[in-house]
């Protein structure tokens, strides 16, 4: 039996939640914002002995201090305006709102990434915020791990948020989790054939999941630099996916930098 008090490796967790209106969309991707607030509350309590950097609005900040101490927690004020100021927001939005992008798959037309302004900007910002944490390193830790604020409430991936799972990950470079992915003509909106070309493979048979990833400070900095360059290049060529698509490409291109743990099935 795993006891939560057992110490984890020296690490800083980075997370975020932001109400983008997902609870109001009339499609299969609708989720109440309470799912994210309760998930974040679970995460903050579960890792209350671990340094955490949280990106939230001023309205959600009281949730953080219900369970967290000031000496091991930092709050980064984050709003929709924060997302709008990201350097890639305009280019992302131009592709997101184009009919040609939405027509790549039926599911994409009604997806949160298509319908919600700020959704793609937020998920694409995860690595930047992780790198910011590694650069500042306010708690003097050796590793930096991104965990989605809603991960503890995700029906397919909640187990990845448990202390026992995180403790079992050997993070010596840049650790990612992958799943088999062999269907669809696109990968989160990114043309599958183009993705394979970027990956340097004939066919992309697995993708990286974006709910949990991280590494040493040096590895995070190196991956972040590669990620920013790749994001610029793919957007310049009209390609748009999510952070999972970009991390998938980088994990294929740089296998010695990445440590990949394959999860069972598409979960």
Give the positions of each predicted feature.
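Short beta-strand-to-loop element that shapes/binds the nucleotide-sugar donor at the catalytic cleft/hinge
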Residues: 175-187
